Design a protein with these regions (language model features):
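Short alpha-helical transmembrane segments in multi-pass integral membrane proteins
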Residues: 1-13, 67-130, 177-228, 285-352, ...
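Membrane-helix interface/capping residues of multi-pass secondary transporters
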Residues: 27, 36-39, 150, 179, ...
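Structural signal for membrane-spanning alpha-helices in multi-pass inner-membrane proteins
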Residues: 99, 142, 168, 172, ...
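Helix-loop interface residues and adjacent transmembrane-helix termini in multi-pass membrane transporters
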Residues: 24, 33-36, 70, 146-147, ...
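Transmembrane helix-bundle signature of multi-pass secondary active exporters and lipid flippases
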Residues: 12-61, 65, 130-134, 221-287, ...
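Juxtamembrane/transmembrane-helix interface segments of polytopic membrane transporters
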Residues: 23, 27, 31, 99, ...
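Short runs within selected transmembrane alpha-helices of multi-pass transporters and secretion channels
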Residues: 60, 126-145, 153-164, 182-197, ...
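Small-residue-rich hydrophobic transmembrane alpha-helices
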Residues: 39-97, 134-146, 150-152, 259-317, ...
């Protein structure tokens, strides 16, 4: 089982890092193309990515988790995949309409001024129109992973990311599409990933059914309950971005937002690692839980937490020894003010990952074993409630430094709450 755990987690983490490169590649090339203004625009758009990914993850990962549990119990799962794709497409329609008709208003709502709206209009239009691909991508990768093909899911994600990196450059510079080129490359990315995942679905090893069944709202709710932790895990970056953007705009203006763009984009990689760890362990935990193997379930949780602690230590080492080097990747203009803001921000903000990784693993664990109350409370607390309250209060008390340290404060509150709920319900959980 340890060998299988290692394979699932390693490949899931690699795949999630691949997905995070969607945004990182855009950030790098856009910083080269338009400097601090480009970083500010992209950071204002991050909440849009967060919401799209969150809904896609809730439907796709929730459905795949329900598929794993139901299949382990011998239930009929022939329609789960098609239902998941159908609901993903339906959920994408409002985003597409906004992208087609009112992208300017969407950017203004996120805090962009007239100059930033002009710069980012076509980019956000392309991203919103491509929402069905972003959302369905989670279904394709999660079902492949939960159907015993984590390597295919990983290869698919990495293939999409490589495409994104190469064509970001080609579309933006040689072709001359600029900001729009970055959006186009990112929009095609999930199509590449899904195409690779189709290799598994067409193979003899596939157990996923493709039977059509009228979309069931009851089935959707059943699956989404198991996908809430994934939803909040993806949404949290968007919520944090919205709150931080407005708070930082009032304290440090556009340059402060650009600095947060550097911090936020690097944090995407850290979140991807921990989400990959949680999603890699989840199908094994769900399978063991469905088969009634509590000893195996506890062993998988222990391994997940040990890996989490090791990764947290490595992340802190990298951040504290390579702060300015990491910032320089996105600071093509060598802006001193941007460097100063981001230097402090990166070190203080990333202290939050000492606890965040553990919370992500615990929330995914409780979701995998159908302990929805703890999973939902933990998810919403760390992703929305605690971080918003802490950011607002600490910003008033300590200014910009208070905003940076709010992640650590919120994650600590969440961790203590999860421990309390788990202890309170320990007899039923065991």
């Amino acid at each position: 089982m340890l060998k299988r755990f290692t394979r699932y987690v390693t490949q899931s983490v690699a795949g999630m890092i691949g997905i995070s490169v969607y945004v990182l590649a855009d950030t790098f090339f856009i910083s080269v193309y338009s400097g601090a203004d480009g970083l500010a625009v992209l950071n204002l758009i991050l909440p849009v990515y967060g919401l799209i990914y969150a809904i896609g993850a809730m439907i796709g990962i929730g459905s795949a988790t329900r598929y794993a549990i139901s299949r382990a119990k011998g239930k009929n799962t022939e329609h789960y995949f098609v239902q998941s794709v159908t609901w993903s497409i339906l959920a994408a329609v409002p985003f597409m309409l906004i992208g087609i008709f009112i992208p300017d208003k969407a950017l203004a709502l996120l805090g962009a001024d007239a100059g930033l709206i002009g710069l980012g209009r076509n980019y956000v239009r392309i991203i919103l129109i491509a929402t069905p691909f972003f959302m369905s991508n989670y279904t394709f990768t999660a079902f492949a992973r939960n159907d015993g093909a984590p390597s295919i899911a990983m290869i698919g994600s990495i293939s999409g990311s490589i495409f994104n990196i190469i064509f970001d450059y080609i579309f933006m510079f040689p072709v001359g599409l600029g900001f729009s080129g970055a959006g186009l490359a990112t929009a095609i990315c999930p199509i590449v990933t899904m195409s690779v995942c189709t290799i598994h679905y067409r193979s003899s090893r596939n157990h996923v059914g493709f039977h059509w069944k009228k979309p069931s709202f009851r089935h959707l709710i059943s699956c989404c309950q198991l996908g809430v932790s994934a939803f909040v895990g993806e949404l949290s970056s968007g919520v944090i971005a919205i709150v931080f953007n407005f708070l930082i705009l009032g304290i440090a203006g556009n340059m402060g937002v650009a600095a947060y763009g550097v911090v936020a984009n690097l944090s995407i990689v850290a979140f991807a690692i921990f989400n990959g760890l949680a999603q890699g362990a989840q199908p094994l935990i769900s399978e063991s839980y469905g088969k009634g193997q509590p000893t195996q379930v506890r062993k998988l949780l222990k391994w997940s937490l040990l890996v989490c602690l090791a990764v947290e230590a490595l992340i802190q080492l990298i951040i504290w020894t390579s702060t300015d080097t990491l910032i320089s990747i996105f600071n093509s203009e060598n802006n001193v003010q941007l460097l100063n803001y981001a230097h402090t921000g990166l070190r203080l903000y990333f202290l939050g990952f000492i606890v965040a990784g553990i919370n992500i693993v615990l929330v995914a664990y409780f979701s995998a074993v159908d302990e929805l109350k703890i999973a939902i409370v933990g998810s919403f607390l760390r992703g929305i409630v605690a971080i918003v309250i802490c950011a607002v209060i600490l910003a008033k008390l300590f200014g910009l430094d208070g905003i940076w340290i709010s992640l650590l404060t919120a994650e600590t509150v969440t961790f203590l709450t999860i421990l309390f709920l788990a202890y309170k319900d320990r007899n039923r959980i065991e």
